[in-house]
Amino acid sequence: MEWTQALIPIVSSCAMTIAAMPLFIGYFQMKKQGQAIREEGPKWHNVKAGTPTMGGLVFLVAAILTGIWVGRPWQNQSTPTLFILLFVLALYGVIGFLDDFIKIFKKRNMGLNSKQKLLGQIIGGIIFYLVYRSEGYPGTLNFFGIELPLGLFYGVFAIFWLVGFSNAVNLTDGIDGLVAGLGTISFATYGIIAWHQQQYDVLVICLSVLGGLLGFFAYNRKPAKIFMGDVGSLALGGLLAAISIMLNQEWTLLLVGLIYVMETASVMLQVTSFKLTGKRIFKMSPIHHHFGMCGWSEWKIDIIFWLVSIVTSLITLWFIW
């Protein structure tokens, strides 16, 4: 794929997102529906109450339509990879959509309970793995260049990977523009890896999501006019995990997605510390809230986290090359 061809899915998905988002925002404003702020959240988030959410639905639809259009499966120009990744994007998006819908329109602030959400994510991971193996893809784990034949245990790993990173991105989505920027960097990185491996279906999906995120960022940067919601964050995390598996570069997500890992680790450490000692390690978790309570502005947190992500992504590409 030439660089000029690579612009097609980016521009297409970005344009659809930019064009549709004002209508989506207008609908929420007309219905007077928006984000509810949890009482245990940061106090400065109270000003965000009522901001439209579920914006991830717009860029997901744009990315899926673009992926189908550019991939042209009806002309037999695509491989099963295209369908598998579109399936993951759609399924985890549906789980997030149900969670958001219950929060906003059913006025139940917690949305799906943790067991319901986890069950949906696990089922999604199981279906992904079964389809993945049925198409003859290898069940070996690439651990920093070392191929580990895990057999059936690779299925357990794949499910854990999708569930873990879908939740990790969801935890990271806590301030204006953060995940939109991180996602742009992550999908650009995997797009480069896919191009290097000549996995063009993966490249098409990466570029389609990248374009959607660029269009979404125009409305999600501080002060955000709309949030992506769980429909966006769960889908992005699940897709990143699936892409790393399809490229047989699972380990790279630990570097490319280092911020997501840090955010999740901060929550786990905070909960463990409080249960064992009654003391908190951070002022608030996930860790972006800790920095916020230390006086950092949202823009400062965004920029520093983006820079860290760029550096770790470049290190990843250096390792692969």
UniProtKB/Swiss-Prot annotation:
Question: What top-tier enzyme class does this entry carry?
Answer: transferase
One GO cellular component term: plasma membrane
Reaction catalysed by this enzyme: UDP-N-acetyl-alpha-D-muramoyl-L-alanyl-gamma-D-glutamyl-L-lysyl-D-alanyl-D-alanine + di-trans,octa-cis-undecaprenyl phosphate = Mur2Ac(oyl-L-Ala-gamma-D-Glu-L-Lys-D-Ala-D-Ala)-di-trans,octa-cis-undecaprenyl diphosphate + UMP
User: Mind telling me which InterPro entries this protein's record contains?
Assistant: Glycosyl_transferase_4, PNAcMuramoyl-5peptid_Trfase, PNAcMuramoyl-5peptid_Trfase_CS
A Pfam family per the record: Glycos_transf_4
Which cofactors does this protein require? Answer: Mg(2+)
Q: Where are the transmembrane segments?
A: 6-26, 50-70, 82-102, 118-138, 143-163, 175-195, 200-220, 226-246, 251-271, 301-321
* One GO BP: regulation of cell shape
Q: In which pathway does it act?
A: Cell wall biogenesis; peptidoglycan biosynthesis
Q: Which UniProt keywords apply?
A: Cell cycle, Cell division, Cell membrane, Cell shape, Cell wall biogenesis/degradation, Magnesium, Membrane, Metal-binding, Peptidoglycan synthesis, Transferase, Transmembrane, Transmembrane helix
Query: What's a Gene Ontology MF term here?
Result: phospho-N-acetylmuramoyl-pentapeptide-transferase activity
Q: Where, subcellularly, is it found? A: Cell membrane
Enzyme Commission number: 2.7.8.13
- Membrane protein topology class: Multi-pass membrane protein
Domain of life of the organism encoding this protein: Bacteria
What is known about what this protein does? Catalyzes the initial step of the lipid cycle reactions in the biosynthesis of the cell wall peptidoglycan: transfers peptidoglycan precursor phospho-MurNAc-pentapeptide from UDP-MurNAc-pentapeptide onto the lipid carrier undecaprenyl phosphate, yielding undecaprenyl-pyrophosphoryl-MurNAc-pentapeptide, known as lipid I.
Q: What protein family is recorded? A: Belongs to the glycosyltransferase 4 family. MraY subfamily.
Listed name of the protein: Phospho-N-acetylmuramoyl-pentapeptide-transferase
